[in-house]
């Protein structure tokens, strides 16, 4: 199967400062990839290089086997067959929704019957057929983003690029628009690359996620694999919350840390030092009379919240604060048992 997108060893610097450093990844036909990372890690620059708005220093980019950038090739934006949706939509204020969508076809008019049919199909797909005669200033933020997607889809591009398209919307609207836009992409069979800073969004909607840091891709994997088997501590902490401790491995598949001796997931040899990470949902708290226990704790303080209970505990010399979705009613100062569900993650060489 020919990859919908292939990036090989892509690098880009601005004024001798590396922004992209040896980026390589591939995207299957119909796949939705989310690129996540902290601000300034190079996500948007990567999208701009794919679109042709920035020229990489080195590397190759191909779409469905067709080279669009290499040492000897640099196709202009209009010849790359890419759709691009940015944060604010960027619609033409003097054009109606219909004409903005038609602009994606190159002439802004939709002259032929085939073009008009395509425009109407994209308006229907994105749920804005009834808005065809309106101007951008008459639309909500969510409606403007739907128009931007319709315009990007109109010329039937090989790939859609979306740069944080939901970040300017309020939470409730963001959720609805996000679900509708991704459903439209899947219904149209389009491969797409989303840039996002929202890890929950990526975990819920991506087929795969690429985690970036300082111009490099730390890991590309399915949401489940990335969360359960992160390649390193940076990827683990970016994609989800974690409680970390310095630790040392034992020969029996355990590690010694501030909570005592815990089972770990690691193939490193005994004696290896590094960082142990536990996901918050792995913890559960039980009365001291619980039949099984590996971690004995003293409850310091419990604070009920809207969706969870915040509990401060002392385990030996370690003070730990957990947000548990459900917890037994325990008085401050009482002894309790902290149960760990499954092994902790261990990252060699990552010392705190």
UniProtKB/Swiss-Prot annotation:
One MF term in the entry's GO annotations: ABC-type ferric iron transporter activity
GO cellular component terms, semicolon-separated: plasma membrane
Enzyme nomenclature, EC number: 7.2.2.7
Stored InterPro entries: AAA+_ATPase (IPR003593), ABC_SmlMolc_Importer (IPR050093), ABC_transporter-like_ATP-bd (IPR003439), ABC_transporter-like_CS (IPR017871), ABC_transpr_FbpC (IPR015853), FbpC_C (IPR041230), FbpC_RD (IPR055223), Mo/tungstate-bd_C_term_dom (IPR008995)
Family designation: Belongs to the ABC transporter superfamily. Fe(3+) ion importer (TC 3.A.1.10) family.
Quaternary assembly: The complex is composed of two ATP-binding proteins (FbpC), two transmembrane proteins (FbpB) and a solute-binding protein (FbpA).
This protein's name: Fe(3+) ions import ATP-binding protein FbpC
């Amino acid at each position: 199967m020919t990859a919908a997108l292939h990036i090989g060893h892509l690098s880009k610097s601005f004024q001798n400062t590396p922004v992209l450093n040896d980026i390589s990844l591939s995207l299957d036909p119909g796949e939705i990839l989310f690129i996540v990372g902290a601000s300034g890690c190079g996500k948007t620059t990567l999208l701009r290089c794919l679109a042709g708005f920035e020229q990489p220093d080195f590397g190759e980019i191909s779409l469905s086997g067709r080279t669009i950038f290499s040492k000897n090739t640099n196709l202009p934006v209009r010849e790359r067959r890419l759709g691009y949706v940015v944060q604010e939509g960027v619609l033409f204020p003097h054009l109606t929704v219909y004409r903005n969508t038609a602009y994606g076809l190159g002439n802004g008019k939709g002259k032929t019957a085939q073009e008009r049919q395509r425009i109407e199909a994209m308006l229907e797909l994105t749920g804005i057929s009834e808005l065809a005669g309106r101007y951008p200033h008459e639309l909500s933020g969510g409606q403007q983003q739907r128009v931007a997607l319709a315009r990007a889809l109109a010329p039937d591009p090989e790939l859609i690029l979306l740069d944080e398209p939901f970040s300017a919307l309020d939470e409730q609207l963001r959720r609805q628009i996000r679900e509708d836009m991704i459903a439209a992409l899947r219904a149209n069979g389009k491969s797409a690359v989303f840039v996002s800073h929202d890890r929950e969004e990526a975990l819920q909607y991506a087929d795969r996620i690429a985690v970036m840091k300082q111009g490099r891709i730390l890991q590309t994997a399915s949401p489940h694999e990335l969360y359960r088997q992160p390649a390193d501590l940076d990827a683990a902490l970016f994609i989800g919350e974690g409680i970390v401790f310095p630790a040392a491995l034992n020969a029996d598949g355990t590690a010694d840390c501030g909570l005592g001796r815990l089972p770990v997931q690691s193939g490193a040899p005994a004696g290896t030092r590094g960082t142990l990470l536990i996901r918050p949902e792995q913890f559960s708290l039980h009365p001291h009379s619980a039949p099984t226990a590996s971690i004995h704790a003293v409850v310091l303080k419990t604070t009920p919240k809207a969706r969870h209970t915040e509990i401060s505990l002392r385990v030996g010399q370690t003070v730990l604060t957990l947000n548990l979705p459900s917890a037994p009613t325990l008085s401050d100062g009482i002894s309790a048992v902290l149960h760990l569900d499954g092994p902790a993650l261990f990252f060699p060489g990552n010392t705190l």
